[in-house]
Structure formats: C-alpha cells, structure tokens
Amino acid sequence: MTGFVLDPYVLDVLLPDLVGHDRSPSAFIVYVYLAHAAGSRGRVQVSYAAMASDTGLSKTCVQRAVAHLRRRKLVVATKATRTSVPDYRVTRPWVGRLPG
C-alpha cells in the first residue's frame, strides 16, 4: 500500500466548505477519491459505476457530486467521445494563491 498525502487545505477549508456550506458531503468524498486515484499524474479515467462501487455511494449520488465539483472548478472532466469514460483532472485552485 502506498501513502497518500492530503493537502492540509482540503481538510481545513474544503471539507467545511463542501460539507457545511454546500451541504454536499458526497462531493468531498468524490474529490478525495479522485485525488487519491489520480496520484502524482493528476488525472484518472474512471466511470461513475466504478466510483460508486469504490466509494459506497450510489451512481446518481456520484453523478451529482461530480457535477458539483465541476461547477466549483475542482475537477475538469473530458471525454474522447460522448460515450467514453471521462478522464478527470483534479485541480487545486488554492495553490499559488495562498500567502506563505
């Protein structure tokens, strides 16, 4: 098993924002899942069904969470064709904007 380092911003700011303010704990779960799956590459190709199975969320819940993350510009999803599995790029918009 390899280690996974989570940016402190994710727990300190993003968690309360997505769960508390946006009332979307599933979006937080999916963000962390995608960040882990993307690893150092920063991108991962995964289906809604696989995300649902891996996170324990329903497929509909995962679809809503991904839509929420896309609106918040926390993930970028691209597809080669309409029916292909999306390629997700996990973004960290706070990097470079925070002092220190």
Question: Which role fits each region the language model picked out?
Answer:
Residues K59, Q63-G100:
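Winged-helix/helix-turn-helix nucleic-acid-interaction surface
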